[in-house]
Amino acid sequence: MVVALSFPEADPAMSPPSAPELHQDEAQVVEELAANGKHSLSWESPQGPGCGLQNTGNSCYLNAALQCLTHTPPLADYMLSQEHSQTCCSPEGCKMCAMEAHVTQSLLHTHSGDVMKPSQNLTSAFHKRKQEDAHEFLMFTLETMHESCLQVHRQSEPTSEDSSPIHDIFGGWWRSQIKCHHCQGTSYSYDPFLDIPLDISSVQSVKQALQDTEKAEELCGENSYYCGRCRQKKPASKTLKLYSAPKVLMLVLKRFSGSMGKKLDRKVSYPEFLDLKPYLSQPTGGPLPYALYAVLVHEGATCHSGHYFCCVKAGHGKWYKMDDTKVTSCDVTSVLNENAYVLFYVQQNDLKKGSINMPEGRIHEVLDAKYQLKKSGEKKHNKSPCTEDAGEPCENREKRSSKETSLGEGKVLQEQDHQKAGQKQENTKLTPQEQNHEKGGQNLRNTEGELDRLSGAIVVYQPICTAN
């Protein structure tokens, strides 16, 4: 189960900025696309970078974050398809609709020098005209977009699971294995994530930091593990592995710490291409390749000062530095030498996606600046059901075999256990592994409390045979 946070709503009265005008030749292309009823977008096509963004006052952090999201291939594909706005019944203040308008304006108006102002529907609930942490804004934006999707899904199908395009694109699962040193019993818990914070305090590369997340952590003394089999705290070892890899991988280099956001300013190398297969709990088949497409950079002593910008890879394969209104070309060598804060990788299969179907007549609508204002007073009532297969019921925990339980079965088991116990997840204390990221990320290897009883985690026990 994915735990989504609640955030203050943006002011629905705020209207998004007007779009730049189309040139005559571009308008002709739009006419042809509308006639065909299909708008093609491929990251292999000569698609240039998005517009520069105005700095409205200490807003470089959100500009850099928005540029990284705008140039995320699977997210851009989904936004340009206009799928969400066609089923959204409450476009006023909807973060998905606001992001959809932002991405559409930015990517469909890419003449040199084009500049747009980020919609206040996207920024007003977070931005208070002072410098903030770009990573925090990223997570805030993704969670509010996720919640907007859930509202549409709940209205169309109240029994659907808490899944959304945001978690389909950015979401993955950790598998935590804990082995009791006393009875040798093993338990597994599965935790969702949208990004992976990396401890860089003692590493020189991102690969080393990823390897460190897999190192076994010894749970002993006051931090001993409560073993459900032994029914008391016992020494144990804990290891983390990726159970399910996301389409888009966000790696957060933990540069900031403490309430003042003091920065760890050290050079950490990162590759243009990354294979995640070695970090999977059940690696099968060939490599799992990822390609770097965006790098978010911070210059300064703390997260509350200095300057943010980013480098992004456009659809035609060229790199650009996006620094507020300035959009300048750069090469991959300079990109790999940046002092990165957040790295964005996309599975190469998703990088080479084909075209997007767009209904006939939608091209003019999304390019019309009045469309943005019209949406705020318009409610659409067509709904498309969103259902998920929850899987077949499983046997009770006492009858489980020693064979590892699947993730789908684990979800059902957890729901049955919660129903029997009458528990509510919001009343269960969360461990640091499940709590939202604080500044600079969290240490995923830090463990407190009884991990068998994690809220939001799916716990699967693997009993062992004992001699009489």
Curated annotation (Swiss-Prot):
Its EC number is 3.4.19.12. SUPFAM superfamilies: Cysteine proteinases (SSF54001). Residues 422-434 have a biased composition (Polar residues). The active site is at C60, H307. Gene3D superfamilies: Cysteine proteinases (3.90.70.10). Residues 1-20, 374-449 are annotated as: Disordered. Keywords: Hydrolase, Protease, Thiol protease, Ubl conjugation, Ubl conjugation pathway. Inhibited by ubiquitin aldehyde. Residues 51-348 form the USP domain. GO terms for molecular function: cysteine-type deubiquitinase activity. GO terms for biological process: protein deubiquitination; proteolysis. Detected in brain, heart, liver, lung, kidney, ovary and spleen. Ubiquitinated. Deubiquitinating enzyme that removes conjugated ubiquitin from specific proteins to regulate different cellular processes. Belongs to the peptidase C19 family. USP17 subfamily. PANTHER family: INACTIVE UBIQUITIN CARBOXYL-TERMINAL HYDROLASE 17-LIKE PROTEIN 4-RELATED, UBIQUITIN CARBOXYL-TERMINAL HYDROLASE. This is Ubiquitin carboxyl-terminal hydrolase 17-like protein B. The lineage of its organism: Eukaryota, Metazoa, Chordata, Craniata, Vertebrata. The gene is Usp17lb.
